[in-house]
Each structure stands twice: as structure tokens, then as C-alpha cells.
Amino acid sequence: MLWFKNLMVYRLSREVSLSADEMEKQLSAFSFTPCGSQDMAKTGWVSPMGSHSDALTHTVNGQIVICARKEEKILPSPVIKQELQAKIERLEGEQHRKLKKTEKDSLKDEVLHSLLPRAFSRFNQTFLWIDTVNDLIMVDAASAKRAEDTLALLRKSLGSLPVVPLTLENPIELTLTEWVRSKELPSGFALMDEAELKAILEDGGVIRCKKQDLFSDEIAVHIEAGKLVTKLALDWQERVQLVLSDDGSLKRLKFSDTLREQNEDIDQEDFAQRFDADFILMTSELAALIKNLIEALGGEAQH
């Protein structure tokens, strides 16, 4: 089981029926196929259980997990430039004239087509967890762009997907700043030793702290000077550690050994049973963490 490392959280903005059986059919039309000789990139769905299953969805207790795979061809620009330059020089020498821009552009396309079949591929996978009980979709992505790209593939596969980023009533950075300034955190949360502070004015600078006592006078001075806490490392109930950002994303999730060892008694050889047990454990913990965080940050914005 792949334990999520990041969470971008989205709210289903209206009632929508997401049944795993129906979704299985819809995703299969967009299942992953490798790049052909002239493809720069391809994206599609693969089984979240890897080689252990052909199913594109996996559901337990109203929680669905799916996985998108992307293949990208790697063509370093110096290589393209070198090939293109050689071609331009050869043609200009043969024709005794300088090539026009349109001719050079056309040559660049030719160079790309000739290089593509020989290019190496880079693969990445992005997991999505759909919580049909709480009407949330979580993407294991460190950037909003990667999350949005994966949701766009899901939207295309399902026909529609009414989701919006989870938004809170109060600006997150104001709440985080108040926690550090007052040295008081909501029940269940403890401050760790890492943060980012930004000046309200764009040219006012950024401070990134690691292994730092965030309740120290040094940090208090920055807050007094008008800097806001935009990232904060937190511990939740000694079970999950994370870095919370002012955009609502949770990064560098780390589950405690005690938590991860809860399913150690399950035979490692029984992949499906262990996958289910770990998925149930992870989603129940993260659902509780998200609920606690929303409350601690002042509640969800009412649209």
C-alpha cells in the first residue's frame, strides 16, 4: 500500500453519485497506454494495486482509490538545439543562403520527430482518494497543477466532476500566525520546529526556519514586524506529522511507526488483505485529521 505523502483536498460542490462499478467502466475508456513513437506524453488510469489487480478502482467502506500514470518523453533542449543547428548549417551550406524563420521552425519539427522514437521516458503516478462518505476528493500531489491535471483526467473520464478546492472561513495564514504568536494550539495539535514566514508586502522577504524553536523571541519579533506564518510543521496526536500551507495543502505526511505497525500481523504475502487493511487505516486516520484541521482552522467557508 502506498501511504500518501501529500494531500490536496477538494470538496464535491454538489451531490454526485460516484459508484465504483460505474466508475470502473468510465475509467477503462481512458486506461493508460504507453507513448507511441511520435507521442510526447500520455496519461491514463492504471490499477491502484499495481500488478496485483486489473481493476482501475478499489473500494472499501465508501472510500475509493484510483491511480493515474503519466509517461513523458525526455528530450533535453541542448540535444534538440545541437541537432537543429547541424541541420540548418548543412542546408544553408548546400543552398548558399540563410534559412527563413518559418523554414527553421519546420526543421525543428523534423528534428523532434526524428528524436522522439529514441527518447527516454519518465513515468510518474498520482493517487486519488475519493471519500464518498464526506464528499471529499484527496489527491496525493505536492503541486496544485499536478492535482488539477489529474482531476481534469477524472472529469474527462466521468463526463463531469463538480469539485472546488476546500476553502475555509478564515485565511489560513492568519490562524497559523495566531497559533505561533499566542503559543496556543488547538487540542490534538503540537508545534514542530519548521515554518515559513512571509511579509505581507511582496518585496518584504521570506524566512524559512528548520530546527527552530518557533515560540522563541526571534520568531515573535518577525511576527510583530508584520510577517505571517504561511507554512507550519505540525504533529497531530503523535500519529501523523505534516507541513500545513496557507493554500490548505498538507505536505510531507509522515505516519508514526505505531500507526503503520498496526497491520504487521497480516501476512505480507496476502497483498490484497494487507492493501485493504492499510487503506482503511490510512483513510480513517486522514479523514479524522482533515475533520480536526477544518475545525481548528475556523471551519469551512459556507458558499
From Swiss-Prot:
NCBIfam families attached to this UniProt entry: PRK00321.1-1, PRK00321.1-3, PRK00321.1-5
Record-given protein name: Recombination-associated protein RdgC
Family indicated by similarity: Belongs to the RdgC family.
GO BP of this protein: DNA recombination; regulation of DNA recombination
Keyword Cytoplasm annotated: yes
Alphabetized HAMAP family for the sequence: RdgC (MF_00194)
Subcellular location per the Swiss-Prot or TrEMBL entry: Cytoplasm, Nucleoid
Organism: Yersinia enterocolitica serotype O:8 / biotype 1B (strain NCTC 13174 / 8081)
